[in-house]
């Protein structure tokens, strides 16, 4: 299998997976599911396709794609932590309004992003509407996603603290302690410099790519 075939297959599978999550999320919201019920309706697909994104870090490391390793690793790690240590282990997190916010933001973003990547790998022209969506919807989707992630994270803190989830207390053979509660607090604080930097970067990219929008459409 060629690298191109592999990358196309990966991106197409991600498009299908996140499309399924998006459809289930919209239907769940339309049918008035509670936030825990909404999460349960997409839990299987969410765990599979978000965990599969770890491959993107490997793609960047071995040079299959030109994505920066550090940025890719941080973005993937933050989501994987939300899916597994937080939403999987902390039932209270599923009651947060952050759940529908992050599900909508993630799924719409990923369907657009992977469609963009698939066409890029195939060296096909990117339709203007796809460029427009990719470099416009982030104005709403990024704040929505970050809000959803933080609200879900905050909703898990009490349970993490009470149950000592993923926490290593002293004394122990390693003679060291690790508090997952503090790990989450530090992760939340990292959004303060991280979000504005990424947000304004995307604004710059939008001006660069869509600045001559009328010419591109022609």
UniProtKB/Swiss-Prot annotation:
Name assigned to this protein: Very-long-chain (3R)-3-hydroxyacyl-CoA dehydratase hpo-8
Major place of residence: membrane
Topology versus the membrane: Multi-pass membrane protein
Gene transcribed to yield this protein: hpo-8
Reactions the enzyme catalyzes: a very-long-chain (3R)-3-hydroxyacyl-CoA = a very-long-chain (2E)-enoyl-CoA + H2O
Keyword NAD part of the UniProt annotation: no
Active site residues according to the UniProt entry: 142, 149
Organism of provenance: Caenorhabditis elegans
GO MF entries: 3-hydroxyacyl-CoA dehydratase activity; very-long-chain (3R)-3-hydroxyacyl-CoA dehydratase activity
